[in-house]
Amino acid sequence: MSRDNSNPKPLRPEIERMIRVDQAGEFGATRIYKGQLAVMGNRGPHSAEIAGMAEQEEGHRARFDAMMAERGVRPTALQPFWSIAGYALGAGTALLGPEAAMACTAAVEEEIDRHYSDQLDRLAETGYEPELTAMIEEFREDEREHRDAALAAGAERAPAYPVLSGLIRLGCRAAIKISERV
C-alpha cells in the first residue's frame, strides 16, 4: 500500500512533539537567563539586555504552556533536568565573562532559528495549524533579534568562541531531539 506524500497532514503526535519541544526550549531559555543574571546581577554590561530577553522568553513559554493546556499536550519528562542544565549553562557562561554569556545566547538562538525554520517548513507543506504557525513565526523573529543583539554585544570575542559556540549548539540539537520524544 503506497502513501500519497504530496500534501501530508501533520499527525496529532507530530504537532504534540512540536509544541512539547518548543515549550521545553522556551523554558530552557528562561533558565539560561536566570543563571546568567544570578552571576552578573543587575550591574553587568549586558544585564539589562539579558533581563529583557528573559522577559520575552517568559512570555513565549507562557503562551506554549497555555497551548499545551488547551490541547492536552504533556510536557517533556526531562523538564527538571533542563531546568538545572539551563541554569548551569547560563551561570557557567556568565562566569566566563559577559562575552561568553552573549556567545551562549548567540549559539542557542542560532539553533532555535534553524529549529523553528524547519518546523515552519513542515507546517507550510500542509497549511494546517495556523495558530501554531503564527506563534512560531513570531517567536523565531524574536530569537533572531536576540542572536543579532548577542553578536553585536561581542559574542564572538568570547574566549574560544568557535569551540564554546559549537558545543552549545551541539547541546541544543541534542536537547531538541530528546525533548521531542521524552
Model-derived segments and spans:
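Non-heme di-metal
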Residues: 1-182
